Each structure stands twice: as C-alpha cells, then as structure tokens.
Amino acid sequence: MQQRVIVGMSGGVDSSVSAALLLQQGYQVEGLFMKNWEEDDGTEYCTAMEDLADAQAVADKIGIKLHTANFAMEYWDRVFEHFLAEYAAGRTPNPDILCNKEIKFRAFLDHAMTLGADFIATGHYARRAETAYNSKGEAYAPLLRGLDNNKDQTYFLHAVHGREINKTLFPVGEIEKPEVRRIAEELDLATAKKKDSTGICFIGERRFNDFLKQYLPAQPGKIVLDNGKEVGEHHGLMYYTLGQRGGIGLGGMKGASEGAWFVLHKDVTNNRLVVGQGHDHPLMQSTQLWSESIDWVAGEQNIPAEGLRCTAKTRYRQPDQACTVFIDENSEHGVRVEFDEPQRAVTPGQSVVFYSDEVCLGGGVIHHTNAPTPNFI
C-alpha cells in the first residue's frame, strides 16, 4: 500500500521539487499551503496570494491535490508574541527557529495527520537518519546536516524534536541547490527561477524597522563610545544587533578615524547603545555563553560530568566552533558552553546549536556571555 505524504508547499522551488521527487519515489503525494500571517490587504508586502498561486500552479503541473490551512492564530500566539517580547527586552530573536518548532513541525504535522498522512515533507536542506530510541525507549530520528553544506538548514531545525523528525521526509536534503533548480526547469515548474525568500518567517520581505514600529514603541536614547562619551542618539535599541557594522549614523564624526563603526554593547538598563571602531573590538569577544533551556533532538540530555565535546554555531552559516558543553548548576535545564577560541559578537536571543560530525544534537537560545561589560556601566 502506498504511503501518504503531505508536503508543506510554500510556493518556492525547494518544496515544489520535494513534491515532485516524492511522486517519482512512489509515494501518494498531496500538498498543503500554510497561511500563517494575516496580510494587510492592499500593501506592497502582500505576497501570500502570489505564493499560493505558485504552489497551485506546481500542484496542477505535477497532478496533486493542494490543501490550504490557516495557522495565523497559532503563529501569533506561539511565535510572534515571543518575538516581540524578546525585542522589547533588548535581545535579538530568531523567529524562524520557533516557527519551525511550533508551526511547521507541530501545527502542520498535527493537521496533516488528520488528513491521513503517514509522513509530512518539507523543502528544508536537512537529512534524517534511521529511527533510533533514546534511553526512555522513545522513538526519534536523528537530524543530519543537508548534503549541500552551503544550504544546510539544521541550524533552524535544531529545536524540532526527533519524534517529529521521525515523521518527516526531506527530499532535497540529499541533493545540492543547483540540482534542485535543474530538476525544476526540467519539469517546467512555475517556481524554477523564483528567487529564494529571505524575510522573517511568514512575514516576508518588508522593511524591518517599519514593521517593528507597528508593534513596539521606539525608545530613542544615547549613543556612547566605549569610554562612555556621548556622540549621538539612537532610534531604539531594538533596531540594532551586536556586531552590526554601519547603520549607526556616525559617519564623518569629528576627530574620529576613518574606520567603520560597530555595535559593541546594548546597555538596556540605561537605554544606551555602545559603539566603537575595530571589527574585533575586545568588548565583542567572549569565550563562554549560557543558555537556560536546550532542545535536544533525541529528547534527552546526555552531558557527562567532564562536559560534552562537540562543535557549535552561534549564527547561521558560521563555521563549526570547537567547544565543551557543561550542565549549568545554576539553572534547571541550562548549559554553559566553553569555546576553544574566542568568539565575536555572540548575541543574546540568537541560538547556539550543537553538532557531532554530521549529527545536529540540538541547541537553545543564548541568554548571556562572558563578553566584558564597558567599565562605565
């Protein structure tokens, strides 16, 4: 009997080719287009209808049914409110990670099961290993890096539990992006030449500062140098991220050298933005970070007393960094990560993700680091 797969079809080339490949592999395939954001009608940002039309065109071309589902309420409650709270607290969140955990691999998976699916599939560049069992006897599938190292998306998938991965297929995870484009062109799919989306998960390509302003009041404050000297005003700490180059508004400052300006520190208590010159400024350097809660793909924490040797990324596409992970005795579920080499601009609110060779072990949100605090704070 054919196994039934529901493919999350976004209107992009990766999910389009995923559906086509699964058909070729003999699965009974249907698509599902998720609407996860209520667009402001008539705005320039309204891409959801275009994406739905593209997904429908592909479904028609390859001869499969396309379902639609609206998860906008779930997205608002489980992802967007957290996103706003993090920005309000002066941190820089990554909503795509929470969106994958709560929407694409929970709300979508649950909905697909009501449609009689054996598996869901997505267009992510990741792979899964054969079903394994943790020490509690729970079945899960280990998460593996995508074959195309340049496109690997396990950084964004680390918070998805292995039991959900066990119900998921990643058809394009086994091939490289140029091959995906080639397959789409060969099959004459409407999405073959469509550019990859880069906006916030489900919110699209809108101007970020304008978008954030609609939900959080801007709180302007002082810009200060690393010695505490006031040199200007910022528009609100939420618009800046640690290590950011430029966009600070200090070009041509009298008496300053020609070098670029970088965001070194966000003094949330006093609403001050600390800036300085030098790509590797000491205030941006850290060797340790703390995370208060870790999502382990296997559903359990296996950190020996002497620490877990592995590699980690603190941002997407960063080369793997050697580290040791320790249980944080001061936190119920947290860890302390000690890097072999100093790290630049590790950003609270972003995620640290752990790897053992090809296997993505899991990760968590960065709470704080041991980067030095400016001496005037």
From Swiss-Prot:
Cellular component, GO annotation: cytoplasm
Keyword Acetylation recorded: no
Organism of origin: Acinetobacter baumannii (strain SDF)
Reactions catalysed according to its record: S-sulfanyl-L-cysteinyl-[protein] + uridine(34) in tRNA + AH2 + ATP = 2-thiouridine(34) in tRNA + L-cysteinyl-[protein] + A + AMP + diphosphate + H(+)
This enzyme's EC code(s): 2.8.1.13
Chain spans, region Interaction with target base in tRNA: 94-96
Protein name as it appears in the record: tRNA-specific 2-thiouridylase MnmA
SUPFAM superfamilies named among the record's database cross-references: Adenine nucleotide alpha hydrolases-like (SSF52402)
GO biological process: tRNA wobble position uridine thiolation
Pfam family, one: tRNA_Me_trans_M
Annotated S-S bridges: 99-201
Gene3D superfamilies linked: Adenine nucleotide alpha hydrolases-like domains, HUPs, Translation factors
Domain of life: Bacteria
Main location: cytoplasm
Site (Interaction with tRNA): 124, 350
InterPro entries hit by this protein: MnmA-like, MnmA-like_C, MnmA-like_central, MnmA-like_central_sf, Rossmann-like_a/b/a_fold
HAMAP family, per database record: tRNA_thiouridyl_MnmA
Family: Belongs to the MnmA/TRMU family.
Positions of the UniProt region annotated as Interaction with tRNA: 151-153, 315-316
Gene (UniProt): mnmA
Binding, ATP: 8-15, 34, 123
